[in-house]
Amino acid sequence: MTSIVIKSTDSGAPTLTGQTGSLVTVLDKCLVVNHVFGTSDDVGFTDQSVEARSEGGTPFNLLLTNVTAARLYIGMPTTFSRAKFDLATVGVGGTYIWEYWNGSAWTTLTVTDGTSGFTADGTVTWTIPSLWATTAVNAVTQYWVRIRASVTPGTNPTVNFVTVGGWTRSHTAATNQAAWRQGTGSNGFIFRLVGDGTTQDRAVGYETLTTLGSTLAGDTATGRFPTDAQFSGGLYWTKSSTADATARPWVVAVSEKLFHLYTDHLSTNTTATHHIFGDIKTFKTGDAYHTIHIAGATVTPGSTNRAADLVAVGAAVLTAHFMSRNYTQLGTSIIISKHSDAAKLGGISTPMGAGGLVFPNPIDGGLYLAQVYVHETSASIVRGELPGFWAPLHSRPLTHLDTFTGTGTLAGRTFMALNMYNSAQAFLETSDTWNV
Protein backbone atom coordinates (compact mmCIF):
# COMPACT_ATOMS: atom_id res chain seq x y z
CA MET A 1 0.00 0.00 0.00
CA THR A 2 1.14 3.54 -0.75
CA SER A 3 -0.13 6.65 1.03
CA ILE A 4 0.19 10.29 0.02
CA VAL A 5 -0.58 13.50 1.96
CA ILE A 6 -1.69 16.68 0.20
CA LYS A 7 -2.34 20.09 1.80
CA SER A 8 -4.24 23.09 0.52
CA THR A 9 -0.99 25.07 0.66
CA ASP A 10 0.86 22.69 -1.68
CA SER A 11 1.72 23.96 -5.13
CA GLY A 12 -1.18 23.66 -7.55
CA ALA A 13 -3.55 22.20 -4.95
CA PRO A 14 -7.29 22.67 -5.59
CA THR A 15 -9.34 25.18 -3.60
CA LEU A 16 -12.04 24.24 -1.08
CA THR A 17 -14.81 26.81 -0.55
CA GLY A 18 -18.42 27.08 0.55
CA GLN A 19 -19.57 26.76 -3.05
CA THR A 20 -21.17 23.84 -4.84
CA GLY A 21 -18.78 21.40 -6.42
CA SER A 22 -15.61 22.46 -4.61
CA LEU A 23 -15.30 19.24 -2.60
CA VAL A 24 -15.87 17.15 -5.73
CA THR A 25 -12.88 18.92 -7.28
CA VAL A 26 -10.66 18.43 -4.22
CA LEU A 27 -11.43 14.71 -4.04
CA ASP A 28 -11.02 14.21 -7.79
CA LYS A 29 -7.58 15.81 -7.71
CA CYS A 30 -6.38 14.11 -4.51
CA LEU A 31 -7.93 10.64 -4.55
CA VAL A 32 -7.20 10.07 -8.25
CA VAL A 33 -4.86 12.50 -10.03
CA ASN A 34 -4.44 16.26 -10.12
CA HIS A 35 -3.42 16.89 -13.72
CA VAL A 36 -2.69 14.85 -16.83
CA PHE A 37 -1.52 16.81 -19.88
CA GLY A 38 -0.57 15.56 -23.33
CA THR A 39 1.57 17.43 -25.84
CA SER A 40 3.27 16.83 -29.15
CA ASP A 41 5.66 19.77 -28.95
CA ASP A 42 5.72 21.17 -25.36
CA VAL A 43 3.93 24.25 -26.71
CA GLY A 44 0.31 23.23 -27.15
CA PHE A 45 -1.22 20.99 -24.47
CA THR A 46 -4.34 18.83 -24.22
CA ASP A 47 -5.86 18.50 -20.75
CA GLN A 48 -6.72 14.81 -20.32
CA SER A 49 -7.34 14.99 -16.57
CA VAL A 50 -11.09 14.31 -16.65
CA GLU A 51 -10.71 11.27 -18.89
CA ALA A 52 -7.76 10.06 -16.82
CA ARG A 53 -9.78 10.03 -13.58
CA SER A 54 -12.85 8.19 -14.86
CA GLU A 55 -13.34 4.45 -15.19
CA GLY A 56 -16.05 5.04 -17.79
CA GLY A 57 -14.48 7.98 -19.56
CA THR A 58 -13.32 8.19 -23.14
CA PRO A 59 -9.95 6.44 -23.61
CA PHE A 60 -7.10 8.75 -24.60
CA ASN A 61 -3.79 8.20 -26.36
CA LEU A 62 -0.83 7.75 -24.05
CA LEU A 63 1.05 9.97 -26.50
CA LEU A 64 -0.98 12.54 -28.42
CA THR A 65 0.86 11.66 -31.62
CA ASN A 66 3.18 8.82 -32.41
CA VAL A 67 6.34 10.94 -32.56
CA THR A 68 9.37 11.15 -30.29
CA ALA A 69 8.54 14.76 -29.36
CA ALA A 70 5.23 13.70 -27.76
CA ARG A 71 5.03 13.61 -23.96
CA LEU A 72 2.49 12.72 -21.28
CA TYR A 73 2.77 14.77 -18.07
CA ILE A 74 1.34 13.60 -14.74
CA GLY A 75 1.30 16.22 -11.97
CA MET A 76 0.48 16.36 -8.26
CA PRO A 77 0.80 19.10 -5.58
CA THR A 78 3.29 16.95 -3.67
CA THR A 79 5.85 14.29 -4.55
CA PHE A 80 4.47 10.85 -5.35
CA SER A 81 5.87 7.40 -6.06
CA ARG A 82 3.45 5.59 -8.35
CA ALA A 83 0.98 5.79 -11.21
CA LYS A 84 -1.48 3.03 -12.02
CA PHE A 85 -2.62 2.59 -15.63
CA ASP A 86 -5.68 0.81 -16.96
CA LEU A 87 -5.32 0.41 -20.72
CA ALA A 88 -8.06 0.30 -23.33
CA THR A 89 -5.58 -0.69 -26.05
CA VAL A 90 -2.23 -2.20 -25.14
CA GLY A 91 0.84 -0.88 -26.85
CA VAL A 92 2.99 -2.76 -29.33
CA GLY A 93 6.70 -1.99 -29.43
CA GLY A 94 8.24 1.30 -28.37
CA THR A 95 10.77 2.29 -25.73
CA TYR A 96 9.59 4.65 -22.99
CA ILE A 97 11.59 7.03 -20.84
CA TRP A 98 10.31 8.37 -17.51
CA GLU A 99 11.65 11.70 -16.26
CA TYR A 100 11.30 14.20 -13.41
CA TRP A 101 12.34 17.85 -13.00
CA ASN A 102 15.41 18.22 -10.75
CA GLY A 103 15.28 22.02 -10.51
CA SER A 104 17.24 22.70 -13.69
CA ALA A 105 16.58 19.89 -16.18
CA TRP A 106 14.43 16.86 -16.96
CA THR A 107 16.27 13.86 -15.52
CA THR A 108 15.79 10.12 -16.01
CA LEU A 109 13.55 8.54 -13.38
CA THR A 110 14.36 4.91 -12.65
CA VAL A 111 11.07 3.01 -12.43
CA THR A 112 9.73 -0.46 -11.78
CA ASP A 113 7.35 -0.87 -14.70
CA GLY A 114 4.37 -3.04 -13.85
CA THR A 115 2.93 -2.37 -17.32
CA SER A 116 5.92 -3.89 -19.15
CA GLY A 117 6.14 -0.92 -21.48
CA PHE A 118 2.38 -0.31 -21.60
CA THR A 119 1.69 -3.79 -22.93
CA ALA A 120 -0.55 -4.59 -19.93
CA ASP A 121 -2.49 -2.91 -17.14
CA GLY A 122 -0.31 -2.22 -14.13
CA THR A 123 1.35 0.16 -11.72
CA VAL A 124 4.63 1.96 -12.33
CA THR A 125 6.55 2.77 -9.13
CA TRP A 126 9.74 4.63 -8.23
CA THR A 127 11.71 5.98 -5.29
CA ILE A 128 11.01 9.68 -4.77
CA PRO A 129 14.13 11.59 -5.91
CA SER A 130 15.71 13.89 -3.32
CA LEU A 131 16.20 16.62 -5.96
CA TRP A 132 12.63 16.54 -7.31
CA ALA A 133 11.41 20.13 -7.68
CA THR A 134 8.26 21.85 -8.86
CA THR A 135 8.09 23.35 -12.33
CA ALA A 136 5.43 24.85 -14.58
CA VAL A 137 3.78 22.66 -17.22
CA ASN A 138 0.93 24.24 -19.17
CA ALA A 139 1.00 27.10 -16.61
CA VAL A 140 0.50 24.72 -13.64
CA THR A 141 3.37 24.62 -11.15
CA GLN A 142 3.65 21.39 -9.19
CA TYR A 143 5.57 18.09 -9.15
CA TRP A 144 5.58 16.40 -12.54
CA VAL A 145 6.72 13.18 -14.12
CA ARG A 146 6.75 12.93 -17.86
CA ILE A 147 6.70 9.98 -20.22
CA ARG A 148 8.15 10.01 -23.72
CA ALA A 149 9.12 7.44 -26.32
CA SER A 150 12.73 7.28 -27.47
CA VAL A 151 11.51 4.67 -29.94
CA THR A 152 7.92 5.19 -31.07
CA PRO A 153 5.54 2.24 -30.62
CA GLY A 154 3.98 0.38 -33.52
CA THR A 155 0.67 0.72 -31.67
CA ASN A 156 0.21 3.75 -29.43
CA PRO A 157 -1.42 2.60 -26.15
CA THR A 158 -4.77 4.12 -25.21
CA VAL A 159 -5.58 4.68 -21.55
CA ASN A 160 -8.89 4.18 -19.73
CA PHE A 161 -7.65 5.80 -16.54
CA VAL A 162 -4.53 6.67 -14.58
CA THR A 163 -4.50 7.12 -10.81
CA VAL A 164 -1.86 8.35 -8.38
CA GLY A 165 -4.01 8.39 -5.23
CA GLY A 166 -5.15 4.87 -5.99
CA TRP A 167 -8.89 5.59 -6.33
CA THR A 168 -10.93 6.14 -9.50
CA ARG A 169 -14.04 8.12 -10.38
CA SER A 170 -16.39 5.17 -10.80
CA HIS A 171 -19.50 7.02 -11.97
CA THR A 172 -20.45 10.46 -13.24
CA ALA A 173 -24.03 11.73 -13.49
CA ALA A 174 -25.53 15.17 -12.99
CA THR A 175 -23.23 18.07 -12.15
CA ASN A 176 -21.67 17.75 -8.67
CA GLN A 177 -22.91 14.16 -8.22
CA ALA A 178 -19.88 11.90 -7.91
CA ALA A 179 -18.70 8.48 -6.78
CA TRP A 180 -15.19 7.11 -6.28
CA ARG A 181 -14.09 3.49 -6.02
CA GLN A 182 -11.43 2.20 -3.64
CA GLY A 183 -8.25 0.87 -5.20
CA THR A 184 -6.05 -2.21 -5.26
CA GLY A 185 -6.25 -4.56 -2.25
CA SER A 186 -9.40 -2.97 -0.84
CA ASN A 187 -13.02 -4.08 -0.59
CA GLY A 188 -13.64 -2.09 -3.77
CA PHE A 189 -16.52 -0.17 -2.20
CA ILE A 190 -17.90 3.18 -3.34
CA PHE A 191 -17.77 6.60 -1.69
CA ARG A 192 -20.80 8.51 -2.99
CA LEU A 193 -20.86 12.31 -2.61
CA VAL A 194 -23.85 14.57 -3.13
CA GLY A 195 -21.70 17.56 -4.00
CA ASP A 196 -24.36 20.21 -4.54
CA GLY A 197 -24.19 21.70 -1.04
CA THR A 198 -22.55 24.97 -0.08
CA THR A 199 -21.06 24.83 3.42
CA GLN A 200 -21.47 21.06 3.59
CA ASP A 201 -22.04 18.09 1.29
CA ARG A 202 -23.75 14.78 2.11
CA ALA A 203 -22.27 11.33 1.54
CA VAL A 204 -22.89 7.60 1.88
CA GLY A 205 -20.95 4.45 1.15
CA TYR A 206 -22.11 1.63 -1.12
CA GLU A 207 -20.96 -1.95 -1.46
CA THR A 208 -21.95 -1.81 -5.13
CA LEU A 209 -23.20 0.97 -7.38
CA THR A 210 -24.71 0.27 -10.79
CA THR A 211 -26.24 3.63 -11.69
CA LEU A 212 -25.48 7.06 -10.24
CA GLY A 213 -28.55 9.26 -10.11
CA SER A 214 -29.02 13.00 -9.79
CA THR A 215 -29.95 12.38 -6.13
CA LEU A 216 -29.35 9.55 -3.66
CA ALA A 217 -32.88 8.32 -4.33
CA GLY A 218 -31.97 7.92 -7.99
CA ASP A 219 -29.00 5.63 -7.36
CA THR A 220 -29.14 1.93 -8.20
CA ALA A 221 -26.96 0.46 -5.48
CA THR A 222 -26.63 -2.13 -2.72
CA GLY A 223 -25.15 -2.15 0.78
CA ARG A 224 -25.57 1.51 1.69
CA PHE A 225 -23.81 2.72 4.85
CA PRO A 226 -25.26 4.34 6.74
CA THR A 227 -28.66 3.12 5.60
CA ASP A 228 -31.37 5.70 5.10
CA ALA A 229 -33.09 4.38 8.23
CA GLN A 230 -29.92 4.91 10.26
CA PHE A 231 -29.15 8.35 8.86
CA SER A 232 -31.45 9.87 6.28
CA GLY A 233 -29.72 11.75 3.47
CA GLY A 234 -26.17 10.69 4.34
CA LEU A 235 -23.48 12.02 6.69
CA TYR A 236 -22.30 15.64 6.59
CA TRP A 237 -18.92 16.48 5.04
CA THR A 238 -17.96 20.01 6.05
CA LYS A 239 -16.33 22.45 3.61
CA SER A 240 -16.74 25.98 5.00
CA SER A 241 -18.60 28.01 7.60
CA THR A 242 -19.71 30.45 4.90
CA ALA A 243 -21.45 29.85 1.57
CA ASP A 244 -19.02 31.89 -0.49
CA ALA A 245 -15.69 31.78 -2.31
CA THR A 246 -13.50 32.04 0.82
CA ALA A 247 -10.76 29.42 0.51
CA ARG A 248 -10.50 27.10 3.52
CA PRO A 249 -7.43 25.12 4.64
CA TRP A 250 -7.60 21.35 4.22
CA VAL A 251 -5.48 18.20 4.34
CA VAL A 252 -6.09 14.94 2.47
CA ALA A 253 -4.25 11.72 3.29
CA VAL A 254 -5.03 8.86 0.92
CA SER A 255 -4.03 5.27 0.30
CA GLU A 256 -5.60 2.77 -2.09
CA LYS A 257 -7.87 1.62 0.74
CA LEU A 258 -8.77 4.65 2.88
CA PHE A 259 -8.68 8.44 2.91
CA HIS A 260 -8.81 11.19 5.53
CA LEU A 261 -10.16 14.68 4.85
CA TYR A 262 -9.41 17.42 7.38
CA THR A 263 -11.20 20.73 6.81
CA ASP A 264 -10.60 23.94 8.73
CA HIS A 265 -14.00 25.42 7.94
CA LEU A 266 -13.42 28.57 10.03
CA SER A 267 -9.76 29.05 9.03
CA THR A 268 -8.89 29.23 12.73
CA ASN A 269 -7.33 25.74 13.24
CA THR A 270 -9.15 25.43 16.57
CA THR A 271 -12.52 23.84 15.72
CA ALA A 272 -11.79 21.98 12.50
CA THR A 273 -13.52 18.81 11.33
CA HIS A 274 -12.25 15.42 10.18
CA HIS A 275 -13.80 12.83 7.87
CA ILE A 276 -12.74 9.25 7.10
CA PHE A 277 -13.81 6.66 4.53
CA GLY A 278 -12.23 3.31 3.71
CA ASP A 279 -10.95 -0.01 5.01
CA ILE A 280 -9.48 -0.37 8.48
CA LYS A 281 -6.76 -2.91 9.31
CA THR A 282 -9.09 -5.70 10.29
CA PHE A 283 -8.33 -8.39 12.87
CA LYS A 284 -10.65 -10.85 11.10
CA THR A 285 -9.17 -13.15 8.46
CA GLY A 286 -11.12 -12.88 5.23
CA ASP A 287 -13.03 -9.77 6.34
CA ALA A 288 -14.79 -8.31 3.29
CA TYR A 289 -16.91 -5.66 5.04
CA HIS A 290 -14.51 -3.64 7.21
CA THR A 291 -15.07 -0.35 5.38
CA ILE A 292 -15.90 2.61 7.64
CA HIS A 293 -17.56 5.98 7.12
CA ILE A 294 -17.00 8.71 9.74
CA ALA A 295 -18.17 12.31 9.30
CA GLY A 296 -20.57 14.88 10.79
CA ALA A 297 -24.04 14.31 12.24
CA THR A 298 -25.81 17.62 11.60
CA VAL A 299 -25.70 20.70 9.43
CA THR A 300 -23.79 22.50 12.22
CA PRO A 301 -20.08 22.27 11.33
CA GLY A 302 -17.63 21.09 13.95
CA SER A 303 -19.80 20.50 16.98
CA THR A 304 -21.27 17.20 15.77
CA ASN A 305 -18.18 15.87 14.02
CA ARG A 306 -16.78 13.29 16.45
CA ALA A 307 -13.86 11.91 14.46
CA ALA A 308 -11.42 12.84 17.26
CA ASP A 309 -13.58 11.38 20.04
CA LEU A 310 -12.77 8.17 21.88
CA VAL A 311 -14.89 6.01 24.17
CA ALA A 312 -14.27 2.89 26.22
CA VAL A 313 -15.15 -0.43 24.61
CA GLY A 314 -18.77 -1.07 25.54
CA ALA A 315 -19.43 2.59 26.36
CA ALA A 316 -21.74 4.99 24.54
CA VAL A 317 -21.65 5.03 20.75
CA LEU A 318 -20.12 7.84 18.73
CA THR A 319 -22.43 9.69 16.38
CA ALA A 320 -21.91 9.46 12.62
CA HIS A 321 -19.60 6.42 12.86
CA PHE A 322 -20.61 3.53 10.59
CA MET A 323 -19.23 0.34 9.02
CA SER A 324 -20.62 -1.63 6.09
CA ARG A 325 -21.39 -4.83 8.10
CA ASN A 326 -20.51 -6.55 11.35
CA TYR A 327 -17.81 -9.17 11.79
CA THR A 328 -20.18 -12.06 10.87
CA GLN A 329 -20.32 -10.53 7.35
CA LEU A 330 -24.13 -10.69 7.53
CA GLY A 331 -26.82 -8.03 7.64
CA THR A 332 -26.41 -4.36 6.85
CA SER A 333 -24.61 -1.24 8.06
CA ILE A 334 -23.66 -1.07 11.75
CA ILE A 335 -22.76 1.69 14.20
CA ILE A 336 -19.17 1.65 15.41
CA SER A 337 -16.99 3.54 17.88
CA LYS A 338 -13.28 4.11 18.52
CA HIS A 339 -11.02 3.67 21.52
CA SER A 340 -7.35 3.98 22.37
CA ASP A 341 -5.03 3.88 25.39
CA ALA A 342 -7.69 5.29 27.72
CA ALA A 343 -5.82 4.39 30.89
CA LYS A 344 -3.05 6.85 30.08
CA LEU A 345 -5.43 9.32 28.47
CA GLY A 346 -7.15 9.76 31.82
CA GLY A 347 -10.74 9.21 30.72
CA ILE A 348 -13.00 6.90 28.81
CA SER A 349 -15.00 9.46 26.84
CA THR A 350 -12.58 12.24 25.92
CA PRO A 351 -11.49 13.74 22.60
CA MET A 352 -7.95 12.67 21.77
CA GLY A 353 -5.34 15.27 22.62
CA ALA A 354 -7.68 17.15 24.98
CA GLY A 355 -6.11 16.00 28.23
CA GLY A 356 -3.86 13.42 29.84
CA LEU A 357 -0.14 13.28 30.53
CA VAL A 358 2.20 16.20 31.13
CA PHE A 359 4.10 17.13 27.99
CA PRO A 360 6.91 16.46 27.64
CA ASN A 361 6.90 13.52 30.02
CA PRO A 362 9.36 14.71 32.72
CA ILE A 363 11.03 11.31 33.12
CA ASP A 364 12.11 10.73 29.54
CA GLY A 365 11.09 13.90 27.70
CA GLY A 366 8.77 11.78 25.61
CA LEU A 367 5.81 12.57 23.40
CA TYR A 368 3.34 9.72 23.87
CA LEU A 369 0.81 8.63 21.28
CA ALA A 370 -1.38 5.58 20.86
CA GLN A 371 -2.99 3.54 18.11
CA VAL A 372 -6.70 4.12 17.52
CA TYR A 373 -8.90 1.02 17.41
CA VAL A 374 -12.35 0.51 15.91
CA HIS A 375 -14.90 -1.55 17.81
CA GLU A 376 -18.44 -2.76 17.25
CA THR A 377 -20.65 -1.20 19.90
CA SER A 378 -23.38 -3.83 20.12
CA ALA A 379 -21.15 -6.56 21.55
CA SER A 380 -17.92 -4.78 22.56
CA ILE A 381 -15.93 -6.41 19.77
CA VAL A 382 -12.62 -4.92 18.63
CA ARG A 383 -12.69 -5.08 14.82
CA GLY A 384 -9.28 -3.59 14.00
CA GLU A 385 -7.00 -0.55 13.76
CA LEU A 386 -7.66 2.81 12.10
CA PRO A 387 -4.84 3.46 9.59
CA GLY A 388 -3.01 6.78 9.57
CA PHE A 389 -4.68 8.27 12.68
CA TRP A 390 -3.06 8.39 16.14
CA ALA A 391 -4.12 9.71 19.54
CA PRO A 392 -1.80 12.03 21.51
CA LEU A 393 -1.82 11.18 25.22
CA HIS A 394 -1.22 14.82 26.19
CA SER A 395 -3.26 18.01 26.03
CA ARG A 396 -2.59 19.53 22.58
CA PRO A 397 1.14 18.93 22.94
CA LEU A 398 2.14 20.43 19.59
CA THR A 399 1.36 23.44 17.44
CA HIS A 400 -1.10 22.88 14.61
CA LEU A 401 0.65 21.35 11.55
CA ASP A 402 3.84 20.62 13.49
CA THR A 403 5.59 17.51 12.21
CA PHE A 404 7.77 14.95 13.97
CA THR A 405 9.46 11.59 13.45
CA GLY A 406 8.74 8.56 15.61
CA THR A 407 11.29 6.62 17.64
CA GLY A 408 11.41 3.11 19.06
CA THR A 409 8.59 1.00 17.63
CA LEU A 410 7.50 4.04 15.59
CA ALA A 411 10.93 4.63 14.02
CA GLY A 412 10.65 5.50 10.34
CA ARG A 413 7.17 6.99 10.69
CA THR A 414 6.41 10.69 10.39
CA PHE A 415 3.40 12.56 11.76
CA MET A 416 1.55 15.86 11.53
CA ALA A 417 -0.45 17.48 14.37
CA LEU A 418 -4.00 18.55 13.51
CA ASN A 419 -6.04 20.73 15.86
CA MET A 420 -9.75 19.92 16.07
CA TYR A 421 -12.91 20.88 17.96
CA ASN A 422 -13.28 20.85 21.78
CA SER A 423 -9.53 21.42 22.32
CA ALA A 424 -8.74 18.11 20.61
CA GLN A 425 -5.64 17.27 18.63
CA ALA A 426 -4.91 14.24 16.47
CA PHE A 427 -1.75 13.00 14.79
CA LEU A 428 -1.99 12.17 11.08
CA GLU A 429 0.61 9.69 9.86
CA THR A 430 2.29 11.30 6.87
CA SER A 431 4.80 8.60 5.93
CA ASP A 432 4.08 5.66 3.67
CA THR A 433 3.90 3.36 6.71
CA TRP A 434 0.20 2.97 7.51
CA ASN A 435 -0.93 -0.21 9.23
CA VAL A 436 -3.05 -2.14 6.71
Residue spans of the language-model regions?
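Short, low-complexity N-terminal tether/leader segments at secretion or assembly junctions of large
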Residues: 1-13, 146-155
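Long, leucine/valine-rich, helix-dominated scaffolding and oligomerization segments
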Residues: 6-11, 15-28, 174-433
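Signature of Asx- and small-polar-rich beta-strand/turn repeats characteristic
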Residues: 28-177
